[in-house]
Amino acid sequence: MDALRLPRRLGVLLWKVVLLFVYAEDCRAQCGKDCRAYCCNGSTPHCCSYYAYIGSILSGTAIAGIVFGIVFIMGVIAGIAICICMCMKNNRGTRVGVIRAAHINAISYPMAPPPYTYDHETEYCTDLPPPYSPAPQASAQRSPPPPYPGNSRKYSSSQNRICNN
């Protein structure tokens, strides 16, 4: 019985397509006052391209808004996915924000902390270095070390004469 209905539906569809092509010849996009900028020289009855009109509408602000919306939706999806993964990982059906204090302490401190004493802080260290004593003067026969490369120190005229000799 369904096999007999199929050709009838096909015939109705075919008839509608034929009517569409017959009457579509008179349907032309006229270049009115609002559309004149997007038509070919304003003389043809058909507008050249609706893509030019859409391209004008999709300015930088609209494109930025679309990109922001897509990124925002991706962030929401990622947040939901993370929430679902965390809930599935726990296998206890823990709701977001409902965590017991004992559970938090078990995460932070897996075992008891070591005892804290002040002994090492209050002890006076007896191994201090010896008090400062000035080193003996070096002999005057040693020459001073050479200057570092790129030394930008200005020399006096007497030093320049010594260096030039």
Curated annotation (Swiss-Prot):
InterPro entries found in the cross-reference section: CYYR1
**Segments for region (Disordered):** 127-165
Query: Superkingdom of the source?
Result: Eukaryota
Please provide the record's keywords in A-Z order.
Answer: Membrane, Signal, Transmembrane, Transmembrane helix
Pfam families referenced in this protein's UniProt entry, alphabetically:
CYYR1
Q: Which residues lie on this side of the membrane: Extracellular?
A: 30-61
| Biased composition regions of type Polar residues, renumbered to the chain | 153-165
Q: Give the signal sequence positions.
A: 1-29
Q: Where are the transmembrane segments?
A: 62-82
Name the major location.
membrane
- Please give the residue ranges for the topological domain Cytoplasmic: 83-165
Q: Where in the cell is it found?
A: Membrane
- Please give the GO cellular component terms listed in this UniProt entry: membrane
Topology relative to the lipid bilayer, per the entry, is: Single-pass type I membrane protein
What the record says about family reads:
Belongs to the CYYR1 family.
| The protein, known as | Cysteine and tyrosine-rich protein 1
Q: Which organism is it from?
A: Rattus norvegicus
Originating gene: Cyyr1
